[in-house]
Amino acid sequence: MAQMMTLSLLSLVLALCIPWTQGSDGGGQDCCLKYSQKKIPYSIVRGYRKQEPSLGCPIPAILFLPRKHSKPELCANPEEGWVQNLMRRLDQPPAPGKQSPGCRKNRGTSKSGKKGKGSKGCKRTEQTQPSRG
């Protein structure tokens, strides 16, 4: 009888601890609490991440990452058509020969007359494959 009581008490303690550990990844998770009322333009975002209620946040949301790292993430409703279009556009790789949005193309020379090194934030879009011989 005492063994059954101990087992029941242990089960109760474990059941109470589970909600505290779920959704915890060792750090505080920022959750979006409400959606933006305005459409977010493509030109100000560099990417996005998804927020799921199953991870402890109150609402499902898409959090758009602003180009300026000092700005807060922008929350949007994943069911809105413009949000899905913006996500698709961000998922597309840049066209060959085009720079990613917000990347300034090296114009050849700087004001001092020396060749510039280009922007460190720009990614190369073309990659060459080594030939097999």
From Swiss-Prot:
Keyword Signal: yes
Keywords, sorted A to Z: Chemotaxis, Cytokine, Disulfide bond, Inflammatory response, Secreted, Signal
Basic residues: compositionally biased ranges: 104-122
Region of interest: C-terminal basic extension: 98-133
Any one GO molecular function term: chemokine activity
Annotated compartments: Secreted
Family annotation (Gene3D superfamilies): 2.40.50.40
Tissue-wise expression: Expressed strongly in lung, spleen, thymus, peripheral and mesentric lymph nodes. Also expressed in the testis, kidney, liver, and heart.
Coiled-coil features, chain-numbered ranges: none
Pfam families the UniProt entry points to: IL8
Assigned GO CC terms: external side of plasma membrane; extracellular space
Residues of the signal peptide: 1-23
GO biological process per UniProt: immune response; inflammatory response; leukocyte chemotaxis; negative regulation of myeloid cell differentiation
Region of interest (Disordered), residue spans: 87-133
Cystine crosslinks: C31-C57, C32-C75, C103-C122
Record function comment: Inhibits hemopoiesis and stimulates chemotaxis. Chemotactic in vitro for thymocytes and activated T-cells, but not for B-cells, macrophages, or neutrophils. Potent mesangial cell chemoattractant. Shows preferential activity towards naive T-cells. May play a role in mediating homing of lymphocytes to secondary lymphoid organs.
Family the UniProt entry places it in: Belongs to the intercrine beta (chemokine CC) family.
Record note on quaternary structure: Binds to CCR7 and to CXCR3. Interacts with PDPN; relocalizes PDPN to the basolateral membrane. Interacts with GPR174.
Anything else known: Three genes code for Ccl21 in mouse. Ccl21b and Ccl21c produce identical proteins while the protein produced by Ccl21a differs at only one position. Ccl21b and Ccl21c have Leu-65 (6Ckine-Leu) while Ccl21a has 'Ser-65' (6Ckine-Ser).
Protein name: C-C motif chemokine 21b
